[in-house]
Amino acid sequence: MSNQYGDKNLKIFSLNSNPELAKEIADIVGVQLGKCSVTRFSDGEVQINIEESIRGCDCYIIQSTSDPVNEHIMELLIMVDALKRASAKTINIVIPYYGYARQDRKARSREPITAKLFANLLETAGATRVIALDLHAPQIQGFFDIPIDHLMGVPILGEYFEGKNLEDIVIVSPDHGGVTRARKLADRLKAPIAIIDKRRPRPNVAEVMNIVGNIEGKTAILIDDIIDTAGTITLAANALVENGAKEVYACCTHPVLSGPAVERINNSTIKELVVTNSIKLPEEKKIERFKQLSVGPLLAEAIIRVHEQQSVSYLFS
């Protein structure tokens, strides 16, 4: 830690989902990580102890609700309750990856809206603010009745690709839902966009990938918010090459990379996969064509600005 933050009432706590990111954020802010322990009883119940006074402090909890999702959610809820009962002044949840975000609406009858339920649980536990990164659905902000700052990963990804000095690029959205995200990256890189339109011509027939936009002879950059099993992104990359793209890069904010994702990426035409560290990944998933960027500086700056009651809006771009 190279600098010391002046206000001792700012406390940053780490739980178990991403301790390396939490330590990086604390170092950038200029504070020591708050003293707490997260353990399990013999039956698996979560036990949290806060090992310093936080009375009257502004507390920030760094916790991605990634795999194991439900374990990390329970840790977070119990930590919020512990801070509330210890008389914290404010309890700010920093969620680099918001689990259950894809369950943001009723796609079919009798389905839950679990993204809303999670928001309710955080508020009921005692959270006073949320700092989130690249929510799968922006409308999740409306699920909260407390302030929420929604940061974007596109500037981080865009800065990386600017530094590569790639020529004749095109930004590609792998589906209709990601067009806005692709447009933001395209505007930053001053590049055109293309869209992959997946259609099933008739029942029981495989989907056909139609590419809307010119990708012939260009370097394509696929962008998504989440790469989970990597089926969509790898099929899209293969379709781009088959239709004349010179080479394909892929990027996302949240590398869930579950199931066959790593194998699919290794077997695909993707030259490089660029992600952030919003989710902690085991070493076996850090494959050769994998580049991980840090969201630590962005989240640290957001924490400082929230604590000092400064504007956070410029971080959105």
From Swiss-Prot:
Optimum pH is 8-8.5. Activities at pH 7 and pH 9.5 are 35% and 85% of the maximal activity, respectively. Involved in the biosynthesis of the central metabolite phospho-alpha-D-ribosyl-1-pyrophosphate (PRPP) via the transfer of pyrophosphoryl group from ATP to 1-hydroxyl of ribose-5-phosphate (Rib-5-P). Mg(2+) 1 binds at H136. GO terms for biological process: 5-phosphoribose 1-diphosphate biosynthetic process; purine nucleotide biosynthetic process; ribonucleoside monophosphate biosynthetic process. It catalyses: D-ribose 5-phosphate + ATP = 5-phospho-alpha-D-ribose 1-diphosphate + AMP + H(+). This is Ribose-phosphate pyrophosphokinase. Its cofactor is Mg(2+). Binds 2 Mg(2+) ions per subunit. Each Mg(2+) binds only one residue (His-136 and Asp-175, respectively) of this protein, however the magnesium ions also bind substrates and water molecules to complete their coordination spheres. Can also use Mn(2+) and Cd(2+) ions, but the activity is less than that obtained with Mg(2+) ions. Keywords: Allosteric enzyme, ATP-binding, Cytoplasm, Kinase, Magnesium, Metal-binding, Nucleotide biosynthesis, Nucleotide-binding, Transferase. It is found in: Cytoplasm.
